[in-house]
């Protein structure tokens, strides 16, 4: 199984308001190969962008891989590492407080992708000295800047 390292970051300008612009940045690494992806969207949230980055990155892999996935998103990392996703599925896509899970469609896509790959989710501190997390942040901001033009 190929070993792949993935860094993702999502961002949203005007999060929680109308007419937002959001984006994500992804760095995929396999051996000596490195691929960078950036994409921007209208009317989104930071959490949708964080989750979309992970879904997009895993979707790009053409065969099952062993993956270390680094993100500064507590939303994404906790949903996996603290078994929120498993509990949501068991509870018919309801949270512990019985409200509907937000971004259910994206979580369902991620759940399907996780059946294909072996993924270790690792939390990194955002806006610190992590080279690849910082690169993903820069890619997301570039995508938003270019989208605004």
Swiss-Prot record:
It is found in: Cytoplasm. Mg(2+) 1 binds at residues 9, 50, 72. It is an enzyme of class 3 (hydrolase). Its cofactor is Mg(2+). Its EC number is 3.1.26.4. Keywords: Cytoplasm, Endonuclease, Hydrolase, Magnesium, Metal-binding, Nuclease. HAMAP family: RNase_H. This is Ribonuclease H. It comes from Clostridium botulinum (strain Hall / ATCC 3502 / NCTC 13319 / Type A). The gene is rnhA.
């Amino acid at each position: 199984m190929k070993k792949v390292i993935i860094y993702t970051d999502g961002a949203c300008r005007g999060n929680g308001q109308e007419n937002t612009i959001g984006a994500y940045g992804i760095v995929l690494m396999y051996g000596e190969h490195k691929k960078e992806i950036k994409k921007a969207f209208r009317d989104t949230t930071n959490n949708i962008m964080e989750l979309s980055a992970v879904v997009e990155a895993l979707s790009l892999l053409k065969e099952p891989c062993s993956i270390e996935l680094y993100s500064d998103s507590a939303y994404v990392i906790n949903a996996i590492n603290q078994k929120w996703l498993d509990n949501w599925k068991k509870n018919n896509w309801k949270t512990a407080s019985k409200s509907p899970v937000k971004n259910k469609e994206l979580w369902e896509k991620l759940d399907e992708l996780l059946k294909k790959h072996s993924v270790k989710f690792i939390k990194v501190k955002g806006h610190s000295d992590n080279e690849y997390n910082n690169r993903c942040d820069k890619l997301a901001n570039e995508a938003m800047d270019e989208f605004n033009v």
